[in-house]
Design a protein with these regions (language model features):
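Catalytic Walker B motif of ABC-type/P-loop ATPase nucleotide-binding domains
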Residues: 153-156
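Conserved beta-strand-loop-alpha-helix hinge in the C-terminal portion
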Residues: 209-233
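A short, proline-enriched helix->beta-strand linker immediately N-terminal to the Walker B motif
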Residues: 147-151
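Helix-to-loop junction immediately C-terminal to a conserved catalytic motif
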Residues: 36
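H-loop/switch region of ABC-family ATPase nucleotide-binding domains
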Residues: 189-190
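ABC ATPase NBD coupling module
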Residues: 52-66, 74, 96-103, 220-225
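The feature captures the beta-strand-to-loop junction immediately N-terminal to the Walker
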Residues: 21-23
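Conserved ABC transporter NBD signature motif
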Residues: 44-51, 212-214
Length: 242
């Protein structure tokens, strides 16, 4: 029997962009879900920004954690407008208060932030978000997850369900936002090209444990072929990125 994450110790320094790869069932999603609060570990502790969140439910951890799922239709309210979704994101982690209308100044701020995505969505603030494409929704979900900079940003294969053009755009936005806001980030991916070209640390998981941990300089010297060779023996599918 394999006990997921048994004995695993992982520290992510402030501002580090950690990329995690591994075969299906290797423990990648379990690691991410454990941090997010999807389940409570049997032993051990989870510390986020100096706070022990081990026994906190997911909704309590929302003040510390931003998350973007693989499914572009998760993380947003499809019947609400772009502006309304962003307003909810702006209130994350703040004391509960009645929702009020959008002031002109706040609406202008939202439009400015949306314009930064480079998708022309600043002119569609009153459009229900469910009418947008998957790439547009995922870009907005990324913006919402980082509207108030989280202590850690969790990216769960967040470009895997997008067409190649949208995936490239969302990944470029990801790097831009993470770099500008100096966000501590954990990204799970099956794309070996992303694994080598994104982030400044690379982790490979196998059977619930860390099988490889490379710093930025080490991973920058690897080729996709060399990384695939290290990946050999994994049970899941791999996308080479070529």
């Amino acid at each position: 029997m394999v006990v997921a994450l048994a004995g695993l110790t992982l520290t992510i320094p402030d501002g580090q962009f950690l990329v995690v790869i591994g075969a299906n069932g290797s423990g990648k999603s379990t690691l991410l879900n454990g941090i997010a609060g999807t389940f409570t570990p049997d032993t051990g502790s989870i510390i986020v920004d100096g706070v022990d969140v081990t026994n906190q439910p997911a909704y309590r951890r929302a003040r510390y954690i931003g998350r973007v799922f693989q499914n572009p239709f998760a993380g947003t309210a499809p019947t609400m407008t772009v502006a309304e979704n962003l307003r909810l994101a702006a209130l994350r982690g703040l004391p509960k208060r009645p929702l009020i209308g959008l002031s002109r100044a706040f609406r202008s701020e939202l439009q400015h932030r949306v314009a930064g995505l480079g998708m022309g969505l600043e002119d569609r603030m009153e459009t229900p978000i469910g009418l947008l494409s998957g790439g547009q929704r995922q870009a907005l979900t990324l913006l919402m997850a980082t509207f108030r900079p989280p202590a850690i940003l969790l990216l769960d294969e967040h470009t895997a369900a997008l067409d190649p053009g949208s995936a490239t755009k969302v990944m470029e936005l990801t790097k831009q936002i993470v770099n500008e806001k100096k966000l501590t980030t954990l990204m799970v991916t099956h794309d070996m090209e992303q694994a080598l070209n994104v982030g400044n640390r690379l982790l490979m998981m196998e059977r619930g444990a860390i099988a490889m941990d490379l710093a930025e300089q080490e991973k920058s010297q690897l080729t996709i072929a060399e990384l695939l060779a290290r990946f050999a023996g994994g049970r899941g599918s791999v996308v080479s990125g070529q």
